């Protein structure tokens, strides 16, 4: 059964209160003007953000909602104004959608609470609608549902071509976008707290390395989301930035020169796609490489995407995920991680301050100390940033937020005409050795190689041999 709650009269009154608060805090719906994001009156807005995929899951249990409140409060205190999170959980033991069109009301109310809290703290939301990977169901779960219904589907990438699976996805889009928030009384499609819809987290396609299957899927789904939404919110595809084999595709810059089944330029040109995205994980994508090699990759990767976005897309660009693996004995130390943050955030500010297309980003991922709400330690993945535990990282992020906030409110038309000028940057954290001895370097490199190789092998086997 698809749950479609109707707001009571009290909720309608609450909606007016929340609506006024959100308008004051966030400036209303976000639009685009060339390579800039703008709010009402055509004034620019820049995004200093974070990822917290777990928000809906935590909020679905009233006893753990304190984690959501604390996360938004900590983020807001550091000037963060964008949160990227999941608006899906397909199947599994904590589903939002337990089977096609069947929704768990407690989980949906968790998402209601997340949106209401984001409003209260003046933070926009980038809501992702499904996953390329198996975490929280994703495309493979949709294919399983169709196969269980008697359709002859055998691989996860059938998600992109099966008419049945595509109908399931469209139904989910409609269920989410037309949902009326039980806290605020506002339909999601009408809520200015929601910055944009993301079609999928990190779409990839082994079945068609040229990117044609993903391209066709995005060309169908982006306009569909726009129609259901009424064109009020922005839409993006969710790409990591990998190049394909099409025109203006700098495929030689892909990690190891490999195709991932997407086309950065062509897909972001699709009708209904309002802005471009890239991700940045040089230590995973280039496992076993040196810090200098990763730094060179970062510079080329960022420079190329900023250029291509300006030259061939004319749209804004966000780094919607960036992170540095930080696990004792297996990843970078904090000094190296904080240096990485400095470099990424300086690149964002350099572009934004000169009127370029790279106008924001979101680090992966924000967590809280387990003392705040039990269970947080279970979400650690080596990339987490706990602001209360890492004063230097918190300072870097907070300073960057202040820098971007100083650019907010400019006239987008005037910004396009601005002459390019040098931009100030953060104070750099010295990379140094940070205590990373030669004795630890080899085990760390081997672990990162093992993790990356294991993920690749697992993904290949699941896609080609063990769907069910």
From Swiss-Prot:
SUPFAM superfamilies: (Trans)glycosidases (SSF51445). Pfam families: Cellulase. Residues 1-23 form the signal peptide. The active site is at 202 (proton donor), 321 (nucleophile). Its EC number is 3.2.1.78. Its main location: secreted. Transmembrane segments: none annotated. Residues 416-430 have a biased composition (Basic residues). Keywords: Glycoprotein, Glycosidase, Hydrolase, Secreted, Signal. It catalyses: Random hydrolysis of (1->4)-beta-D-mannosidic linkages in mannans, galactomannans and glucomannans. InterPro entries: Glyco_hydro_5, Glycoside_hydrolase_SF, MAN-like. Substrate binds at residues 86, 201, 281, 364, 371. This is Mannan endo-1,4-beta-mannosidase 3. It comes from Oryza sativa subsp. japonica (Rice).
């Amino acid at each position: 059964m698809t749950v479609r709650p109707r707001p009571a009269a009290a909720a309608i009154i609450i909606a007016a209160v929340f609506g006024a608060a959100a308008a004051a805090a966030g400036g209303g719906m976000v639009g685009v003007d060339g390579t800039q994001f703008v709010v009402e009156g055509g004034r620019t807005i820049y995004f200093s953000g974070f990822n917290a995929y777990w928000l809906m899951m935590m909020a679905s249990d009233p006893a753990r909602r304190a984690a959501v409140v604390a996360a938004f409060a900590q983020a807001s205190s550091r000037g963060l104004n964008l949160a990227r999170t999941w608006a899906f959980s397909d199947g599994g033991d904590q589903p939002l959608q337990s089977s096609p069109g069947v929704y768990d009301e407690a989980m949906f109310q968790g998402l209601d609470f997340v949106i209401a809290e984001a409003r209260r703290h003046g933070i926009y939301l980038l809501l992702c609608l499904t996953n390329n990977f198996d975490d929280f169901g994703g495309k493979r779960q949709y294919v399983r549902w169709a196969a269980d219904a008697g359709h002859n589907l055998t691989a996860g990438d059938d998600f992109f071509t099966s008419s049945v699976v595509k109908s399931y996805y469209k139904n989910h889009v409609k269920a989410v976008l037309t949902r009326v928030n039980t806290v605020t009384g506002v339909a999601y499609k009408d809520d200015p707290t929601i910055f944009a819809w993301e079609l999928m987290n990190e779409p990839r396609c082994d079945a068609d390395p040229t990117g044609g299957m993903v391209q066709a899927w995005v060309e169908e789904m982006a306009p569909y989301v726009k129609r259901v939404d009424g064109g009020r919110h922005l839409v993006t595809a969710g790409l990591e930035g990998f190049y394909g084999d099409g025109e203006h595709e700098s495929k030689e810059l892909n990690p190891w020169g490999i195709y991932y089944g997407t086309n950065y330029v062509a897909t972001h040109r699709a009708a209904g796609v309002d802005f471009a995205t890239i991700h940045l994980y040089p230590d995973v994508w280039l496992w076993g490489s040196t810090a200098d090699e990763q730094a060179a990759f970062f510079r080329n990767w960022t420079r190329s995407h900023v250029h291509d976005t300006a030259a061939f897309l004319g749209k804004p660009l966000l780094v919607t995920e960036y992170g540095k693996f930080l696990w004792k004995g297996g990843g970078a130390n904090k000094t190296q991680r904080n240096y990485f943050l400095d470099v990424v955030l300086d690149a964002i500010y350099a572009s934004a301050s000169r009127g370029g297309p790279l106008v924001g980003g979101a680090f992966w991922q924000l967590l809280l100390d387990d003392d705040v709400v039990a269970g947080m330690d279970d979400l650690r993945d080596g990339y987490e940033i706990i602001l209360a535990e890492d004063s230097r990282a918190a300072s870097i992020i907070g300073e960057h937020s202040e820098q971007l906030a100083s650019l907010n409110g400019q006239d987008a038309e005037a910004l396009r005409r601005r002459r390019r000028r040098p931009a100030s940057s953060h104070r750099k954290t010295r990379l140094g050795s940070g205590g990373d001895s030669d004795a630890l370097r080899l085990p760390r490199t081997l672990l990162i190689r093992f993790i990356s190789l294991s993920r690749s092998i697992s993904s290949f086997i699941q896609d080609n041999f063990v769907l069910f």
